[in-house]
Amino acid sequence: MKVAVLGAGAWGTALAAHLAARHDTLLWARDAALVAELAARRENVRYLDGVALPPALRYEADLTAALSHAQADDALCVIAAPVAGLRALCRAMRDAGRVPAHFVWVCKGFEADTRLLPHQMVAEELPDHASYGVLSGPSFAREVAQGLPVALTVASASAACRGRTLAAFHHGAMRIYTGDDVVGVEVGGAVKNVLAIATGIADGLGLGLNARAALVTRGLAEMSRLGVALGGRAETFTGLTGLGDLILTATGDLSRNRTVGLQLAAGRSLDDILAALGHVAEGVRCARAVLSIARERGVDMPITEAVCAVLFDGVAPRDAVSGLLRRDAKAE
Protein backbone atom coordinates (compact mmCIF):
# COMPACT_ATOMS: atom_id res chain seq x y z
CA MET A 1 0.00 0.00 0.00
CA LYS A 2 1.14 3.56 -0.70
CA VAL A 3 0.91 5.85 2.33
CA ALA A 4 1.72 9.55 2.66
CA VAL A 5 2.21 11.06 6.11
CA LEU A 6 1.85 14.85 6.18
CA GLY A 7 3.82 16.35 9.03
CA ALA A 8 7.24 15.35 10.33
CA GLY A 9 6.87 16.23 13.98
CA ALA A 10 7.33 13.56 16.63
CA TRP A 11 3.97 11.85 16.02
CA GLY A 12 4.08 11.99 12.24
CA THR A 13 7.63 10.63 12.23
CA ALA A 14 6.74 7.80 14.61
CA LEU A 15 3.71 6.76 12.57
CA ALA A 16 5.68 6.94 9.33
CA ALA A 17 8.38 4.72 10.83
CA HIS A 18 5.76 2.14 11.81
CA LEU A 19 4.06 2.27 8.39
CA ALA A 20 7.34 1.94 6.50
CA ALA A 21 7.83 -1.55 7.94
CA ARG A 22 5.02 -2.82 5.69
CA HIS A 23 4.13 -0.13 3.16
CA ASP A 24 5.58 2.26 0.58
CA THR A 25 5.62 5.26 2.90
CA LEU A 26 6.44 8.91 2.18
CA LEU A 27 6.92 11.45 4.99
CA TRP A 28 6.26 15.07 4.04
CA ALA A 29 7.47 18.23 5.80
CA ARG A 30 7.18 21.78 4.49
CA ASP A 31 10.66 22.56 5.84
CA ALA A 32 13.06 21.51 3.08
CA ALA A 33 16.01 21.70 5.47
CA LEU A 34 14.32 19.24 7.82
CA VAL A 35 13.57 16.89 4.91
CA ALA A 36 17.21 16.97 3.82
CA GLU A 37 18.34 16.30 7.39
CA LEU A 38 15.94 13.36 7.75
CA ALA A 39 17.16 11.81 4.52
CA ALA A 40 20.81 12.27 5.43
CA ARG A 41 20.74 11.24 9.08
CA ARG A 42 17.82 8.79 9.20
CA GLU A 43 16.90 10.40 12.48
CA ASN A 44 14.55 13.24 13.43
CA VAL A 45 16.95 15.05 15.74
CA ARG A 46 14.59 17.98 16.08
CA TYR A 47 11.54 16.07 17.32
CA LEU A 48 12.48 12.44 18.01
CA ASP A 49 16.18 12.32 18.73
CA GLY A 50 17.91 9.01 19.32
CA VAL A 51 15.42 6.93 17.30
CA ALA A 52 16.76 5.41 14.07
CA LEU A 53 14.33 5.64 11.16
CA PRO A 54 13.87 2.68 8.79
CA PRO A 55 15.86 2.71 5.54
CA ALA A 56 12.67 2.16 3.51
CA LEU A 57 11.08 5.42 4.68
CA ARG A 58 11.28 8.19 2.08
CA TYR A 59 11.01 11.96 2.53
CA GLU A 60 9.43 14.76 0.51
CA ALA A 61 9.23 18.56 0.77
CA ASP A 62 6.82 19.03 -2.15
CA LEU A 63 3.20 18.73 -0.97
CA THR A 64 1.77 17.97 -4.41
CA ALA A 65 4.23 15.12 -4.85
CA ALA A 66 3.35 13.73 -1.43
CA LEU A 67 -0.38 13.93 -2.14
CA SER A 68 0.10 12.29 -5.54
CA HIS A 69 1.70 9.35 -3.75
CA ALA A 70 -1.58 8.69 -1.88
CA GLN A 71 -4.14 9.31 -4.63
CA ALA A 72 -5.16 5.75 -5.50
CA ASP A 73 -8.19 4.07 -3.95
CA ASP A 74 -5.94 1.50 -2.29
CA ALA A 75 -3.70 4.21 -0.74
CA LEU A 76 -3.97 6.23 2.47
CA CYS A 77 -3.00 9.74 3.57
CA VAL A 78 -2.27 10.48 7.25
CA ILE A 79 -2.46 14.12 8.33
CA ALA A 80 -0.10 14.53 11.29
CA ALA A 81 -0.30 18.30 11.65
CA PRO A 82 -1.56 19.92 14.88
CA VAL A 83 -5.14 21.17 15.03
CA ALA A 84 -3.96 24.68 14.12
CA GLY A 85 -2.61 23.39 10.80
CA LEU A 86 -5.37 20.98 9.77
CA ARG A 87 -7.60 23.47 7.96
CA ALA A 88 -4.71 24.88 5.94
CA LEU A 89 -3.67 21.42 4.80
CA CYS A 90 -7.22 20.58 3.74
CA ARG A 91 -7.34 23.78 1.71
CA ALA A 92 -3.98 22.99 0.15
CA MET A 93 -5.19 19.53 -0.85
CA ARG A 94 -8.33 21.01 -2.38
CA ASP A 95 -6.52 23.81 -4.19
CA ALA A 96 -3.96 21.38 -5.61
CA GLY A 97 -6.73 19.10 -6.87
CA ARG A 98 -5.07 16.27 -4.97
CA VAL A 99 -7.53 15.27 -2.24
CA PRO A 100 -6.65 11.65 -1.34
CA ALA A 101 -9.33 9.01 -1.73
CA HIS A 102 -8.98 8.10 1.96
CA PHE A 103 -7.34 10.07 4.76
CA VAL A 104 -7.19 10.26 8.53
CA TRP A 105 -5.91 12.91 10.91
CA VAL A 106 -4.21 12.33 14.25
CA CYS A 107 -4.47 15.79 15.87
CA LYS A 108 -6.41 16.38 19.07
CA GLY A 109 -8.21 19.51 20.20
CA PHE A 110 -10.59 22.26 19.11
CA GLU A 111 -9.79 25.00 16.62
CA ALA A 112 -9.07 28.08 18.74
CA ASP A 113 -11.09 30.71 16.85
CA THR A 114 -14.08 28.65 15.75
CA ARG A 115 -14.16 26.06 18.57
CA LEU A 116 -14.75 23.41 15.92
CA LEU A 117 -13.62 19.81 16.19
CA PRO A 118 -11.30 18.49 13.47
CA HIS A 119 -14.02 16.65 11.54
CA GLN A 120 -16.07 19.85 11.38
CA MET A 121 -13.14 21.75 9.88
CA VAL A 122 -12.60 19.01 7.31
CA ALA A 123 -16.29 19.03 6.39
CA GLU A 124 -16.17 22.79 5.85
CA GLU A 125 -13.10 22.67 3.62
CA LEU A 126 -13.90 19.43 1.75
CA PRO A 127 -17.71 19.23 1.67
CA ASP A 128 -17.80 16.80 -1.27
CA HIS A 129 -15.46 14.26 0.31
CA ALA A 130 -16.62 11.45 2.59
CA SER A 131 -13.88 8.87 3.20
CA TYR A 132 -12.02 10.37 6.12
CA GLY A 133 -11.72 9.86 9.86
CA VAL A 134 -9.68 10.24 13.03
CA LEU A 135 -6.99 7.95 14.42
CA SER A 136 -6.56 8.36 18.16
CA GLY A 137 -5.76 6.61 21.41
CA PRO A 138 -3.27 6.36 24.29
CA SER A 139 0.09 6.74 22.61
CA PHE A 140 3.42 8.46 23.08
CA ALA A 141 5.32 9.03 19.84
CA ARG A 142 8.65 7.84 21.19
CA GLU A 143 7.29 4.48 22.31
CA VAL A 144 5.58 3.92 18.95
CA ALA A 145 8.81 4.77 17.12
CA GLN A 146 10.63 2.26 19.32
CA GLY A 147 8.20 -0.48 18.30
CA LEU A 148 6.58 -0.87 21.72
CA PRO A 149 2.97 -2.16 21.92
CA VAL A 150 0.14 0.33 21.40
CA ALA A 151 -3.61 0.19 20.71
CA LEU A 152 -5.43 2.91 18.75
CA THR A 153 -8.93 3.51 17.41
CA VAL A 154 -9.91 4.73 13.97
CA ALA A 155 -13.33 6.37 13.88
CA SER A 156 -15.06 7.21 10.62
CA ALA A 157 -18.52 7.22 9.08
CA SER A 158 -16.89 5.57 6.06
CA ALA A 159 -16.37 1.81 6.17
CA ALA A 160 -13.84 2.21 3.36
CA CYS A 161 -11.76 4.64 5.42
CA ARG A 162 -11.89 2.39 8.47
CA GLY A 163 -10.81 -0.58 6.38
CA ARG A 164 -7.99 1.26 4.66
CA THR A 165 -6.65 2.58 7.98
CA LEU A 166 -6.86 -0.86 9.57
CA ALA A 167 -4.96 -2.39 6.66
CA ALA A 168 -2.25 0.26 6.90
CA PHE A 169 -1.60 0.31 10.63
CA HIS A 170 -2.63 -3.05 12.11
CA HIS A 171 0.66 -4.92 12.17
CA GLY A 172 3.67 -5.46 14.37
CA ALA A 173 3.13 -4.07 17.87
CA MET A 174 0.22 -1.81 16.85
CA ARG A 175 -3.37 -2.97 17.31
CA ILE A 176 -6.19 -1.01 15.66
CA TYR A 177 -9.83 -0.97 16.72
CA THR A 178 -12.57 0.53 14.55
CA GLY A 179 -15.70 2.55 15.22
CA ASP A 180 -17.88 5.35 13.91
CA ASP A 181 -18.20 7.72 16.90
CA VAL A 182 -16.03 10.48 15.48
CA VAL A 183 -17.38 13.10 17.89
CA GLY A 184 -16.75 10.96 20.96
CA VAL A 185 -13.22 10.09 19.90
CA GLU A 186 -12.35 13.72 19.14
CA VAL A 187 -13.84 15.12 22.35
CA GLY A 188 -11.94 12.54 24.41
CA GLY A 189 -8.70 13.44 22.67
CA ALA A 190 -9.23 17.15 23.29
CA VAL A 191 -10.44 17.17 26.88
CA LYS A 192 -7.90 14.67 28.24
CA ASN A 193 -5.13 17.16 27.50
CA VAL A 194 -6.74 19.78 29.74
CA LEU A 195 -7.30 17.23 32.49
CA ALA A 196 -3.68 16.10 32.27
CA ILE A 197 -2.61 19.64 33.19
CA ALA A 198 -4.76 19.30 36.32
CA THR A 199 -3.16 16.02 37.38
CA GLY A 200 0.27 17.50 36.72
CA ILE A 201 -0.56 20.40 39.02
CA ALA A 202 -1.76 18.02 41.74
CA ASP A 203 1.33 15.83 41.46
CA GLY A 204 3.58 18.88 41.42
CA LEU A 205 1.98 20.11 44.64
CA GLY A 206 2.59 16.72 46.25
CA LEU A 207 -1.10 16.01 46.83
CA GLY A 208 -0.67 12.25 46.56
CA LEU A 209 -2.00 9.34 44.55
CA ASN A 210 -5.48 9.58 46.06
CA ALA A 211 -5.84 13.07 44.62
CA ARG A 212 -4.57 11.90 41.24
CA ALA A 213 -7.13 9.08 41.15
CA ALA A 214 -9.91 11.47 42.09
CA LEU A 215 -8.93 13.93 39.37
CA VAL A 216 -8.75 11.23 36.70
CA THR A 217 -12.13 9.78 37.71
CA ARG A 218 -13.98 13.06 38.06
CA GLY A 219 -12.21 14.35 34.96
CA LEU A 220 -13.54 11.39 33.01
CA ALA A 221 -17.04 12.38 34.16
CA GLU A 222 -16.45 15.91 32.82
CA MET A 223 -15.19 14.54 29.52
CA SER A 224 -18.20 12.24 29.17
CA ARG A 225 -20.73 14.96 29.98
CA LEU A 226 -19.32 17.30 27.36
CA GLY A 227 -18.92 14.55 24.77
CA VAL A 228 -22.51 13.36 25.12
CA ALA A 229 -23.76 16.96 24.97
CA LEU A 230 -21.93 17.36 21.64
CA GLY A 231 -23.34 14.13 20.19
CA GLY A 232 -20.82 11.49 21.23
CA ARG A 233 -21.77 8.14 22.76
CA ALA A 234 -21.21 7.61 26.49
CA GLU A 235 -19.51 4.24 26.01
CA THR A 236 -16.79 5.81 23.87
CA PHE A 237 -15.36 7.58 26.91
CA THR A 238 -14.62 4.33 28.76
CA GLY A 239 -12.57 3.09 25.79
CA LEU A 240 -9.11 3.73 24.40
CA THR A 241 -9.74 7.28 23.23
CA GLY A 242 -11.39 8.36 26.48
CA LEU A 243 -10.27 6.66 29.67
CA GLY A 244 -7.24 5.06 28.03
CA ASP A 245 -5.83 8.29 26.64
CA LEU A 246 -6.68 10.15 29.84
CA ILE A 247 -4.78 7.68 32.03
CA LEU A 248 -1.71 7.82 29.82
CA THR A 249 -1.61 11.59 29.42
CA ALA A 250 -2.40 12.29 33.07
CA THR A 251 0.19 9.92 34.52
CA GLY A 252 2.93 9.37 31.91
CA ASP A 253 6.20 11.22 32.27
CA LEU A 254 6.39 11.71 28.48
CA SER A 255 3.18 13.79 28.56
CA ARG A 256 3.71 17.42 27.56
CA ASN A 257 0.43 18.50 29.15
CA ARG A 258 1.26 16.81 32.45
CA THR A 259 4.65 18.53 32.30
CA VAL A 260 2.92 21.91 31.99
CA GLY A 261 0.97 21.16 35.17
CA LEU A 262 4.05 20.02 37.06
CA GLN A 263 5.92 23.18 36.09
CA LEU A 264 3.00 25.45 36.98
CA ALA A 265 2.91 23.86 40.42
CA ALA A 266 6.62 24.62 40.75
CA GLY A 267 5.88 28.31 40.26
CA ARG A 268 7.08 28.79 36.69
CA SER A 269 5.20 31.09 34.33
CA LEU A 270 3.24 29.62 31.44
CA ASP A 271 5.31 31.54 28.88
CA ASP A 272 8.55 30.15 30.28
CA ILE A 273 7.16 26.63 30.40
CA LEU A 274 6.02 26.66 26.78
CA ALA A 275 9.28 28.20 25.60
CA ALA A 276 11.30 25.49 27.33
CA LEU A 277 8.99 22.72 26.15
CA GLY A 278 9.62 23.48 22.49
CA HIS A 279 6.65 21.35 21.40
CA VAL A 280 2.90 21.82 21.23
CA ALA A 281 0.93 21.31 24.46
CA GLU A 282 -2.59 21.04 23.05
CA GLY A 283 -4.22 21.28 26.47
CA VAL A 284 -3.10 24.90 26.75
CA ARG A 285 -4.31 25.68 23.24
CA CYS A 286 -7.81 24.27 23.63
CA ALA A 287 -8.60 24.79 27.33
CA ARG A 288 -10.49 28.04 26.70
CA ALA A 289 -12.51 26.46 23.88
CA VAL A 290 -13.45 23.47 26.05
CA LEU A 291 -14.64 25.69 28.89
CA SER A 292 -16.49 28.06 26.56
CA ILE A 293 -18.37 25.21 24.88
CA ALA A 294 -19.17 23.65 28.26
CA ARG A 295 -20.68 26.87 29.57
CA GLU A 296 -22.62 27.37 26.36
CA ARG A 297 -24.07 23.85 26.65
CA GLY A 298 -24.69 24.05 30.39
CA VAL A 299 -22.16 21.31 31.16
CA ASP A 300 -20.52 21.43 34.59
CA MET A 301 -16.72 21.10 34.26
CA PRO A 302 -15.14 22.33 37.52
CA ILE A 303 -11.71 20.77 36.92
CA THR A 304 -11.49 22.43 33.52
CA GLU A 305 -12.55 25.73 35.11
CA ALA A 306 -9.77 25.41 37.67
CA VAL A 307 -7.17 24.69 34.97
CA CYS A 308 -8.26 27.75 32.98
CA ALA A 309 -8.09 29.89 36.11
CA VAL A 310 -4.46 28.88 36.61
CA LEU A 311 -3.50 29.17 32.94
CA PHE A 312 -5.15 32.45 32.07
CA ASP A 313 -6.43 34.27 35.17
CA GLY A 314 -3.36 34.27 37.39
CA VAL A 315 -4.87 32.01 40.06
CA ALA A 316 -2.22 30.17 42.07
CA PRO A 317 -2.30 26.38 41.54
CA ARG A 318 -2.81 25.67 45.26
CA ASP A 319 -5.70 28.15 45.41
CA ALA A 320 -7.34 26.48 42.41
CA VAL A 321 -7.14 23.10 44.15
CA SER A 322 -8.57 24.61 47.34
CA GLY A 323 -11.49 25.93 45.32
CA LEU A 324 -12.25 22.44 44.05
CA LEU A 325 -12.16 21.04 47.59
CA ARG A 326 -14.62 23.69 48.80
CA ARG A 327 -17.30 22.68 46.30
CA ASP A 328 -20.60 21.51 47.76
CA ALA A 329 -21.08 17.79 48.34
CA LYS A 330 -23.14 15.99 45.69
CA ALA A 331 -24.19 12.55 44.54
CA GLU A 332 -21.74 10.80 42.23
From Swiss-Prot:
Pfam families xref list: NAD_Gly3P_dh_C (PF07479), NAD_Gly3P_dh_N (PF01210)
Assigned keywords, A-Z: Cytoplasm, Lipid biosynthesis, Lipid metabolism, NAD, NADP, Nucleotide-binding, Oxidoreductase, Phospholipid biosynthesis, Phospholipid metabolism
Residues in the signal sequence: none
Principal localisation: cytoplasm
Catalytic reaction annotation: sn-glycerol 3-phosphate + NAD(+) = dihydroxyacetone phosphate + NADH + H(+); sn-glycerol 3-phosphate + NADP(+) = dihydroxyacetone phosphate + NADPH + H(+)
Cellular component, GO, one term: cytosol
Molecular function GO labels: glycerol-3-phosphate dehydrogenase [NAD(P)+] activity; NAD binding
Catalytic residues identified in the record: 192
Residues involved in sn-glycerol 3-phosphate binding: 108, 137, 139, 192, 245, 255-257
EC numbers, comma separated: 1.1.1.94
Transmembrane segments: none
Cellular compartments annotated: Cytoplasm
Biological process according to GO: carbohydrate metabolic process; glycerol-3-phosphate biosynthetic process; glycerol-3-phosphate catabolic process; glycerophospholipid metabolic process; phospholipid biosynthetic process
Record-listed NADPH binding positions: 11, 30, 108, 141, 256, 280, 282
NAD listed as a keyword: yes
Pathway involvement of the protein, from the record: Membrane lipid metabolism; glycerophospholipid metabolism
KW Plastid (keyword) present: no
Biological role stated in the UniProt entry: Catalyzes the reduction of the glycolytic intermediate dihydroxyacetone phosphate (DHAP) to sn-glycerol 3-phosphate (G3P), the key precursor for phospholipid synthesis.
Family of the protein in this entry: Belongs to the NAD-dependent glycerol-3-phosphate dehydrogenase family.
Protein's recorded name: Glycerol-3-phosphate dehydrogenase [NAD(P)+]
Organism: Burkholderia thailandensis (strain ATCC 700388 / DSM 13276 / CCUG 48851 / CIP 106301 / E264)
Lineage: Bacteria, Pseudomonadati, Pseudomonadota, Betaproteobacteria, Burkholderiales
